Regions:
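Ser/Thr-glycine-rich phosphate-binding loops at phosphate-binding pockets of nucleotides
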Residues: 86, 90-91
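Cys-dependent protein tyrosine phosphatase-like superfamily
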Residues: 1-81, 93-178
Length: 178
């Protein structure tokens, strides 16, 4: 687990300079008993395991994704950081959905996802089959040809149990457009 080692100075910067409040941990059950990286410094760890890509449509996954977006609606959560084990698949999926909901262009959200290529898992790109399947299913099941990916993600999150007021709070917390 050397790839996730936080230096003492890095921890100090996160706590003292960035005033980090929350660690959102997407890793699975094998990491359930591990303490949060900065728990001793008062940073709350919230662990909700996620699955990536086209696995996001199961009832269990939708409940978990809904829980994350409900958390994003809480101002007290911020500033926060989120992570999985490698920083590519689960993190990439959650951040893609978040950015898309917030109105980031598809081109920019996909480009940001492609930056997960720098993780320990290697090349990730827009034609990576699981990612492409996720986008295809979002549009097939939650949008129409005339609608955007943003609309499809919004509808997906409503199906995940996230209320309209919570989605509005996510926007208010993370953009200057509210």
């Amino acid at each position: 687990d050397v790839h996730c080692h936080l230096t003492q100075d890095g921890g100090r910067v996160l706590v003292e300079e960035m005033h980090l409040r929350t660690e959102l941990d997407m890793r699975g059950e094998s990491k359930a008993d591990e303490p949060g990286v900065l728990e001793d410094d008062g940073v709350q760890r919230i662990r909700i395991p996620l699955v990536p890509y086209d696995e996001i449509f199961t009832p269990e996954a939708m409940e978990a994704y809904g829980a994350y977006f409900q958390l994003f609606s809480e101002p007290a959560l911020f500033p926060c950081y989120l992570h999985c084990w490698g920083g590519a698949d689960r993190t990439g999926t959650l951040v893609y959905l978040l950015q898309t909901l917030l109105g980031v262009s598809r081109a920019d959200a996909v480009l940001d996802y492609e930056l997960t290529t720098m993780s320990v898992w290697g090349v990730r790109y827009r034609r990576f089959e699981p990612f492409a399947q996720m986008e295809k299913r979002l549009l097939q099941w939650y949008g129409t040809d005339a609608q955007t990916m943003q609309t499809a993600v919004h509808r997906y999150l409503r199906d995940c149990g996230v209320a309209e007021r919570e989605l509005a709070m996510v926007r208010a917390n993370l953009t200057d457009r509210g």
